A protein has these predicted regions:
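Short beta-strand edge/turn micro-motifs at domain boundaries
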Residues: 27, 131-166, 227-252
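C-terminal motif of bacterial Sec signal peptides marking the signal peptidase cleavage site
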Residues: 17-19
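Solvent-exposed loop/turn segments at secondary-structure junctions
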Residues: 78, 84-86, 125-127, 154-157
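Surface-exposed, charged secondary-structure patches
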Residues: 92-135, 185-223, 246-253
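Short, low-complexity N-terminal intrinsically disordered segments enriched in polar/charged residues
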Residues: 21-66, 71, 158-189, 197-200, ...
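Short, well-ordered alpha-helical segments enriched in acidic and aromatic residues
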Residues: 62-83, 88-90
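Bacterial N-terminal signal peptides that target proteins for export
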Residues: 1-8
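A structural feature that tracks compact, well-ordered secondary-structure segments
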Residues: 47-48, 57-60, 70, 80-83, ...
Length: 253
């Protein structure tokens, strides 16, 4: 994976995931995120997406994870589960809010030149302590708000060893987490954007690809025979297509 236009956010927390252990909204203050990511061109502001994920997390903690997920979902949103990609409204409508929601934190944001489409990648931990990765696609609506269009997650295999419990007097080194903000290049007037690299055509219902309206960001998913949930995002940067996110996620227990 090539990292371009990497932007760092400093925050005092043991790790991105630990900082978010009681809700997705824990992490760098919004003011810090906005200040560091404000150099993005035009309407494509990664900080807007990070702030939206924090808002979503706060709602999940206060209203319930399923209730919040339904409220923040775009029309026609999809969830990628162990049985494949399903309609979010139907899937969420049959579920109840867990007593404790997952905790998660954003690690990367890739956004189209016009700022209408964004893909986030991050880490999560469920109430049982299982940790893994997630990917969410956000689409800007007519009123300017962002709603999620696609969501998938999967655990680390194998799981990392349990974190050591610290005792009084131990010296703990504080880590500085970072959020990568990747913004697609805006073409010059009259410049044609080349098509993204060709991809194999998957079986109907088991693979799909989407291209942003301005042609600078593509994301796609596959549900593979072994149950692996594959998702990737490519963006147009400095005259070439670059893979920003690529995940092969195992089924959740």
């Amino acid at each position: 994976m090539k990292a371009r236009s990497t932007l760092l956010i400093a925050a005092v927390c043991a790790s991105t995931l630990t900082a978010c252990s009681s809700g997705r909204d824990r992490g760098p203050p919004i003011q810090v995120i906005n200040r560091v990511l404000a150099t993005a061109p035009g309407a494509a502001q990664p900080s807007t997406i990070v702030a939206r994920e924090i808002e979503f997390a706060r709602a999940a903690r206060e209203e319930g994870q399923i209730t919040a997920a339904a409220r923040f979902a775009a029309p026609g949103a999809k969830v990628h589960r162990e049985g494949g990609v399903k309609d979010a409204a139907a899937a969420l409508g049959s579920e109840k809010n867990p007593d404790i929601s997952d905790a998660w934190g954003t690690a990367a944001v890739v956004i189209s030149c016009d700022g209408r489409l964004a893909v986030t990648q991050g880490r999560y931990r469920d109430p049982q302590g299982i940790v893994g990765d997630y990917v969410t696609v956000w689409q800007r609506q007519r009123d300017g708000t962002f709603l999620w269009q696609y969501d998938v997650s999967g655990p680390d295999v194998p799981q990392p060893p349990p974190r050591r419990e610290f005792e009084d007097g131990d010296i703990v080194v504080i880590a500085i987490p970072s959020i990568r903000g990747l913004v697609a290049s805006c073409p010059d007037r009259g410049e044609a954007i080349p098509a993204p690299p060709a991809i194999p055509i998957g079986e109907e219902g088991k693979a799909e690809a989407w291209l942003s309206r301005d042609g600078t960001l593509r994301w796609r998913w596959e549900h593979r025979e072994d149950g692996i949930k594959f998702v990737a995002a490519d963006y147009y940067y400095n005259g070439e297509w670059v893979t920003a996110i690529e995940e092969s996620l195992a089924p959740r227990p």
